[in-house]
Amino acid sequence: MLGANDGLSSNFCLMMGVVGGGASATTILLTGVAGLVSGSCSMALGEWLSVTNSHELAVSQADRAMGTAAPEETLPGGSSAGDAASAAFFSFVLFALGALVPLLPFALLPAALRIVGTIAASIAALFVLGLATSLFNARSPLFSGLRQVMIGSAAAAFTYGIGQAFDALARWAR
């Protein structure tokens, strides 16, 4: 769930930043695709490294404790290369699914509805993810959903504003 939230939030903010900067539809779409691919790869790599490094640390600590090299399979709860690959795969997929939320409306809707559709889909998905987090945080679903929407929307508005400021500065410098 966290990977999906990362994908949704980062791609929503990224796309709103270039929308604020007055980018063309092609540039906005390319930015969304690049955000999806680069973010998914980054999440997968980070997850693989995290699981692999944790496993290597456990092996190293077991070696020191026993004063010898411990076979990996004797470690309690030890991770394997398969665990790292599986974690990386799921991080990649979850991030990509989240990143698709702002991207698909922009890609599929008529020009007049692209930005509104992207914002609406992203806000709806933020709310749903917030509802889902209420299963784990002992907060009410409404509170969790609205909090997620407020934070995600504020971040997207901030990047939109940065895009507008950059566009204004670029126009002034001409």
How would you label these PLM feature ranges?
Residues S122, I151-G163:
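Selective transmembrane alpha-helices of multi-pass membrane proteins
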Residues V128-A154:
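Interfacial loop-to-transmembrane junctions
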Residues M1-V101, A112-A125, A132-T133, A155, ...:
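Hydrophobic, small-residue-rich transmembrane alpha-helices and their short perimembrane loops
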Residues V59-S60, S144, F166:
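Short amphipathic alpha-helical leader/targeting segments
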Residues G21, F106-P110, N137-A138, D167:
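Short helix-capping/hinge motifs at transmembrane helix termini and TM-loop junctions
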Residues G161-R174:
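Juxtamembrane boundary at the C-terminal end of a transmembrane helix
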